[in-house]
Amino acid sequence: MPVNAIDFSDLTGNKQVAPPVQQQQPPQPQQQLGVKNPKTGEVQPAMGYPTAQMGQGDELLQLFPTPVLICPYLLDYSKELEWIKNADCRKENKGGDAGNVIHYNRQSNDTFVLDRPELANIRAFIESRLAKFVKEIMASDDQLVITQSWLNKAKKGESHHEHVHPNSMVSGVWYPQIHEQLPPIQFRSRNQRDISLSTKQYNTFNSATFMLPMKRGELILFPSNLTHSVPANQMEEERISLSFNTWPKGNMGDERSLTYLPLDRCV
């Protein structure tokens, strides 16, 4: 007799065996890729995470990608460019040793250029894209405000070393005058590798650097702690860009997740 079967006997002595009782399994929670909400502890579905099918049912995920937003400026800015060209800059900056002199690009004496009325339209454009970055990419209701902003001018042969932007959350660069065939900015991967394998083809997983081509009038926004540099200008025309930093307006964080930062108490 099968295990867990029930023996029924009728009055005639004939035996009837009921089928085994099936054990009901509790429903298994459906697993899904998501992110943990630090406030509630709940796992929320990840929105827009990049995936790729690898064949045989294998799926490749790109966790924690770095957001870099490129925004075109579609209005005429000839007046703003003329003002920018005439803006005073610091003297030529040199580095390296006697046998290997490096000529760095020059920065404007004014480190709050976006406060100037001559650049009011450019500032409005940048602020609108900052709001988009915060709302649609960072999914936050907070507001980022522009702190410092300055011009960078590079003659032929001038460059800028690798760096990050401290005391800033999102940084940006607007390019009013560049040569579109020469990428004006290079990013370095946050995933530094101690062991290097031979590489047949570079991709987002094995590349250490990424040179980003830009067009005149385009704006780029990126996390301020993302290491970047500026390759040497190889053209006769001066390369000009406008850089800026940002910081959240008002208090930051959340009390429940123990990340609350009352900036009004720090004054």
Whereabouts are the PLM-identified features?
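Non-heme Fe(II)/2-oxoglutarate
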Residues: 50-138, 159, 238-239, 246-267
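Active-site region of the double-stranded beta-helix
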Residues: 117-147, 155-169, 176-180
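Catalytic core of non-heme Fe(II) oxygenases with the double-stranded beta-helix
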Residues: 152-221, 251-260
